[in-house]
């Protein structure tokens, strides 16, 4: 099937094509077609990355098998193009939504990677992008590694999403020249546990939706246990239910797509929510439980807000979308403590980790 496309080339190139076609006793069209066909078959630098972003859903399946399911097939390291895909979308995660906070465990992992790459450059006398790093991390440039560690030590435990994005620019922009770093060194820096920790950020950066998550789960069938947890504080009850695989269920049986339900019940109301609401609520309450001094005035997030006791009123209160729930100080602190604790250990923590890697999380 033929199709016509009008192209403009320099006169010298046209003349060279005509001369070459005359020598080979063929038409200019046939010669140009052969040159284009041969050229497109040649793999150019960067082609691998463009293939990954051309079909992000296929790339996520490929990375999920490797990073989350551990199906490495003899190789534990991602290619440089795959690493670039991960880093680009990890930074994109902090550009989506508004008024979100970055939890330091995930951000710490990415800053660990940044520090390791910087240390390798310094140790091997490689050129350092000093102007860029000084601007991002406020370094003097006299002792790169020590100054970077001092910056890390002074970093606040609660980081705004836009500042987190700012800190990740050197990684995403290939400031450290991954092409020059030996494969063995990359494997030591980008370990599977680190990649697993930032995988939910990558999904969020891709604007991963519920339908895509369910399709991924149905195709790869990760084992995420069914869990139900109930938290009571004062007159409020939070019920967290994860649909998944029940104990003793045989492989190959009917597969239940993992999904989370959050049911908030008060004296006169019952309101259902899903993964997005719980992930933001849990993120805020976990930060407040660990670092109450950093959130003494509470926070107004994208869908979730809270105000600790004694800030605006003697009571503490939190809200999801348009709902506001006021609680006595003791009940509020109990809710924060219980939610943060139960979601960090035991079967519920394992199920939430699995859900993060399916649905994405900040």
Curated annotation (Swiss-Prot):
Domain of life according to the entry: Bacteria
One example GO MF annotation: DNA binding
Keyword terms of this UniProt record: DNA-binding, Plasmid, Repressor, Transcription, Transcription regulation
UniProt keyword Transcription regulation, yes or no: yes
The UniProt record lists the keyword Repressor: yes
Extra facts: C protein has a much higher affinity for pifO than for ori-1. C protein, like p22 proteins, contains a number of alpha-helical regions and these may be involved in forming a pattern of non-covalent contacts with DNA which is different from that formed by most DNA-binding proteins.
Function noted in UniProt: Transcription repression of its own gene by binding to the PIF operator (pifO) and replication initiation from the primary origin (ori-1). Transcriptional repressor of the pifA and pifB.
Protein name (record): Transcriptional repressor PifC
Source organism of this protein record: Escherichia coli (strain K12)
Name of the gene: pifC
């Amino acid at each position: 099937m033929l199709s016509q496309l009008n192209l403009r080339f320099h006169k010298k190139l046209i003349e060279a094509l005509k001369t070459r076609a005359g020598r080979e006793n063929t038409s200019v069209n046939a010669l140009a077609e052969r040159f284009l066909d041969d050229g497109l078959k040649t793999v150019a630098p960067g082609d691998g990355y463009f293939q990954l972003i051309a079909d992000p859903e296929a790339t996520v399946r490929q990375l999920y098998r490797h990073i989350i399911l551990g199906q490495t097939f003899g190789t534990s390291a991602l290619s440089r193009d795959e690493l670039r895909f991960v880093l680009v979308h990890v930074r994109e995660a902090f550009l989506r939504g508004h008024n979100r906070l970055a939890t330091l465990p995930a951000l710490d992992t990415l800053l660990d990677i940044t520090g390791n790459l910087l240390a390798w450059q310094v140790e091997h006398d490689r050129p350092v992008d000093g102007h860029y790093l000084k601007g991002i991390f406020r370094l003097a440039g006299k002792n790169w590694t020590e100054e970077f560690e001092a910056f890390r030590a002074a970093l606040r435990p609660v980081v705004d999403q836009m500042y987190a994005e700012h800190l990740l620019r050197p990684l995403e922009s290939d400031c450290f020249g991954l092409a020059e770093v030996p494969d063995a060194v990359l494997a030591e820096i980008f370990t599977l546990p680190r990649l697993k920790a930032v995988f939910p950020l990558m999904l969020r950066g891709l604007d991963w939706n519920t339908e895509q998550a369910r399709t991924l789960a149905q195709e790869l069938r990760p084992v995420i246990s069914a869990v139900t947890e109930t938290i009571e504080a004062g007159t409020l009850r939070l019920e967290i239910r994860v649909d998944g695989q029940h104990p003793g269920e045989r492989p190959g049986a009917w597969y239940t797509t993992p999904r989370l339900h959050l049911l908030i019940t008060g004296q006169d109301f019952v309101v259902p929510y899903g993964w997005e609401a719980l992930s933001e609520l849990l993120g805020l309450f976990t930060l407040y439980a660990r670092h109450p001094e950093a959130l003494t005035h509470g926070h107004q997030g994208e869908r979730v807000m809270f105000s600790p006791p004694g800030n605006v009123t003697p009571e503490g209160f939190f809200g999801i979308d348009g709902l506001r729930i006021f609680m006595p100080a003791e009940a509020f602190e109990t809710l924060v403590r219980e939610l943060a604790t139960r979601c960090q250990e035991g079967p519920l923590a394992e199920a939430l980790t699995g859900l993060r890697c399916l649905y994405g999380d900040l």
